Every structure is written in C-alpha cells, then in structure tokens.
C-alpha cells in the first residue's frame, strides 16, 4: 500500500481515483499531478513501483498544501474572520450557514438538532 502525504492509498483503485483520498486533491488536481510526475492514470496503485510513488510525492510537495497543512490553513482563515468581526465570521461563530442560505425552515445540518419548546416538554411529561 502506497503512503503519500500521510494517507494510505487503497491498492485496488486506479491511481487517479486513489489520489482523491488525500484532503485537498480532487479529480483535476490528481490528473495534473500524474501528468507532472509522468505516471499513467489508468494504472492501479498496486502496480506502481517505488520510483513512481516518489515522483508523485515530489509533485504533490511542489504544489499547494494538502492534508494537515491545508486543514490548519482553513481553520486559521475561519478564526481570522471571527476575530475581525466580519459577517461571515459572525455566522461561523453562531454555527449558522455562511453563504446566504435560508434558515427559517432548513439548515438543520449546520444548526444541529431542533431545540424543543416549553409546550412540547409539558406535553411529554404529562403523558
């Protein structure tokens, strides 16, 4: 099993699909990395030799950040938005949708489970 950027790539998948298991690498970026590393996309991870894996590692390191560094960057950007008091930071702080979605009826994923009303609690205890 090839280990790239701290992620074990599945051996039975094609390399262009397996690279998308790394946080920060999507389909188009995986194809660009393989082109830069001069590796064919229609090969399985188990068929790669050590030299090809090293070329892929080098291509990923030369590109932008992935995995832990990228997660850290994203969290730092969110913290910065909260600190400067922007509208987006306020929405992050209140755990509400940030990009303008409606919240009157939807947004249950972001807002969490429904908070019961006092009337509902009285009915539940009366039964």
From Swiss-Prot:
SUPFAM superfamilies assigned: S13-like H2TH domain
Higher taxonomy:
Bacteria, Pseudomonadati, Acidobacteriota, Terriglobia, Terriglobales
The UniProt family comment states: Belongs to the universal ribosomal protein uS13 family.
Task: Please give the Gene Ontology molecular function terms for this protein.
Answer: rRNA binding; structural constituent of ribosome; tRNA binding
Matching Pfam families: Ribosomal_S13
Coiled coil (UniProt feature): none
Give the residue ranges for region: Disordered.
Answer: 93-127
Output this protein's name.
Small ribosomal subunit protein uS13
Q: Which residues form the signal peptide?
A: none
Highest taxon above the source species? Bacteria
Described purpose of this protein according to its UniProt entry: Located at the top of the head of the 30S subunit, it contacts several helices of the 16S rRNA. In the 70S ribosome it contacts the 23S rRNA (bridge B1a) and protein L5 of the 50S subunit (bridge B1b), connecting the 2 subunits; these bridges are implicated in subunit movement. Contacts the tRNAs in the A and P-sites.
| Gene3D superfamilies referenced in this protein's UniProt entry, alphabetically | 1.10.8.50, 30s ribosomal protein s13, domain 2
- According to its record, what are the GO cellular component terms? cytosol; small ribosomal subunit
Assembly description: Part of the 30S ribosomal subunit. Forms a loose heterodimer with protein S19. Forms two bridges to the 50S subunit in the 70S ribosome.
NCBIfam families per UniProt = uS13_bact
Instruction: Provide this UniProt record's keywords sorted from A to Z.
Output: Ribonucleoprotein, Ribosomal protein, RNA-binding, rRNA-binding, tRNA-binding
For biological process, the GO terms are:
translation
């Amino acid at each position: 099993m090839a280990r790239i950027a701290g992620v074990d790539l599945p051996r039975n998948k094609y390399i262009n699909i397996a690279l998308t298991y790394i946080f920060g690498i999507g389909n188009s970026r995986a194809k660009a990395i393989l082109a830069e590393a001069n590796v064919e996309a229609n090969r399985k991870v188990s068929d790669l030799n050590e030299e090809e894996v090293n070329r892929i590692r080098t291509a990923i390191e030369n590109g932008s950040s992935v995995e832990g560094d990228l997660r850290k960057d994203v969290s730092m950007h969110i913290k910065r938005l909260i600190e400067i008091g922007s509208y987006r930071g306020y929405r992050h702080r209140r755990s509400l949708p940030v990009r303008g979605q409606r919240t009157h009826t939807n947004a249950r994923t972001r807002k969490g489970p429904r908070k019961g009303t006092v009337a509902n609690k009285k009915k539940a205890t009366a039964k």
